[in-house]
A protein has these predicted regions:
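Short beta-strand segments
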Residues: 55-56, 94-96, 132-134
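Alpha-helical support elements that line or immediately flank enzyme active sites
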Residues: 94-124
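Short, Lys/Arg-enriched N-terminal segments with co-localized hydrophobic residues
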Residues: 2-14
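Glycine-rich, mobile lid/loop segments that gate access to catalytic sites or pores
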Residues: 113-168
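Short coil/turn connectors at secondary-structure junctions
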Residues: 48-51, 73-74, 87-92, 125-129, ...
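N-terminal amphipathic/basic leader segments beginning at the initiator methionine
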Residues: 11, 15-70
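Short acidic, glycine/serine/threonine-rich loops at helix termini
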Residues: 66, 105-108, 141-146
Length: 168
């Protein structure tokens, strides 16, 4: 009931119709979410560029995902899919752009795990509560030196959803 759920005449659980619409909202529009991003140098520099973003929920979230059906998946997709398929709660997301972390062999999985762990440490959550998303050039490994340097510097804010979006 607190979530606006109700059972209809068939006993199916549905959302209440008295929901609030948020126009021009973002990932931090909902209460309890904060985000931030930084330019780490993964992409070409620009005044409005960000290439690593973090998203945090102040409480565990139940998640669902739609993933690529391509036979070649990046380790970032594989890790996030495992978290979602495992049914565990999620509290954070790390997203990077500029490098897809795809078609890079075993190093891609090592790097995706480390990036998730770095994000988890910064967010104060467990690494199995973090999803990772990478987009960009295929065949290039995550630049872990840049990620190690810049992830701890990301400042999170309740109104920084646009910053996070710019990093995707």
């Amino acid at each position: 009931q607190a979530l606006g759920l109700f059972e209809d005449e068939n006993g199916d659980e549905n959302m209440s119709s008295d929901m609030t619409t948020v126009n021009s909202g973002g990932v931090t529009s909902a209460e309890g979410f904060s985000a931030g991003a930084i330019f780490a140098g993964i992409k070409t520099a620009g005044a409005d560029k960000r290439d690593i973003g973090l998203l945090l929920s102040d409480r565990p979230c139940t998640v669902a995902g739609t993933f690529s059906q391509n036979s070649v998946l990046s380790p970032s997709v594989t890790l996030s899919k495992a978290v979602v398929d495992g049914g565990g709660d999620v509290r954070g997301v790390i997203a990077n752009s500029g490098v897809a972390n795809c078609a890079v062999g075993e190093q891609g999985l090592i790097d995706a795990r480390e990036a998730s762990a770095l994000a988890a440490e910064k967010l104060g959550v467990s690494s199995d509560e973090v999803l990772i998303a990478s987009t960009g050039v295929i065949g290039v490994e995550l630049p872990m030196a840049l990620m190690r340097e810049h992830i701890p510097q990301i400042a999170l804010g309740d109104n920084d959803g646009d910053e996070f979006a710019a990093a995707i």
